[in-house]
UniProtKB/Swiss-Prot annotation:
Protein name: Large ribosomal subunit protein uL6
A GO CC term attached to the entry: cytosolic large ribosomal subunit
Gene name of the record: rpl6
One Gene Ontology term from the biological process aspect of the record: cytoplasmic translation
Stated family: Belongs to the universal ribosomal protein uL6 family.
Keywords in alphabetical order: Ribonucleoprotein, Ribosomal protein, RNA-binding, rRNA-binding
InterPro entries: Ribosomal_uL6-like (IPR000702), Ribosomal_uL6-like_a/b-dom_sf (IPR036789), Ribosomal_uL6_a/b-dom (IPR020040), Ribosomal_uL6_arc (IPR019907), Ribosomal_uL6_CS2 (IPR002359)
Record keyword RNA-binding present: yes
Organism: Ignicoccus hospitalis (strain KIN4/I / DSM 18386 / JCM 14125)
HAMAP family named in the record: Ribosomal_uL6_A
Length: 186
């Protein structure tokens, strides 16, 4: 199969956002904060900031690409786009507290979420909150917000995993905390 000579992806940089590229490290600064990520694992991929007609863009490119490198170009571009969205608007995950008999109470204590009275258990279950992420409990909803989509998503996964039930039929025992919405903050 023929190899493509030049594979590239462009990511637009909006006003008020600064992007710095040093080798394989990308630093994005915006009104909501700053994110930094190292793409040194992406071998053969070059990242740079270009300016055409007064419009800044991040160019992710590779030469003589096979199938994996083509996919890697778009993956790196998507990560940079998510970083830009995070520092301009932010990310929000919404979770629902579901219970049938034993009322679950959720508290945020420092860098962890404590889940009390889950299926009548005496000891609280604990989920870790990653740095740079805020967790709020509003009634039966848990709202998770932050600039880094991966940290926000991992925190939501930690909470969902902490309420995982084993050795019971999940169709009958539906108690837990579940993700029901992922969105960009406005």
């Amino acid at each position: 199969m023929a190899k493509a000579v030049w594979v590239h992806a462009l990511v637009d940089v909006p006003e008020g956002v600064e992007v710095e590229v040093e080798g394989s490290k990308v630093k994005v600064r915006g009104p909501k904060g700053e994110l930094e990520r190292d793409f040194s694992h992406a071998k053969g991929i070059r990242i740079r900031v270009v300016e055409e007609e007064g419009k800044k863009q991040v160019l992710v490119e590779t030469f003589f690409a096979n199938r994996k490198r083509k996919a890697l170009v778009n993956t790196v571009a998507a990560h940079i786009k998510n970083m830009i969205t995070g520092v301009t608007k932010g990310w929000r995950y919404k979770m629902k507290i579901v219970f049938s008999h034993f009322p679950i109470s959720v508290k945020v204590v420092g860098d962890r979420v404590e889940i009390h009275n889950f299926i009548g258990e005496k000891a609280p279950r604990v989920a870790k909150v990653l740095p740079g992420v805020t967790v709020k409990v509003q009634g039966r909803d848990v709202i998770i917000e932050g600039t880094d989509i991966e940290k926000v998503a991992q925190t939501a996964a930690n909470i969902e995993q902490a309420t995982k039930i084993t050795e019971f039929d999940r169709r009958v025992f539906m108690d837990g905390i579940y993700i029901y919405a992922r969105e960009v903050m406005s």
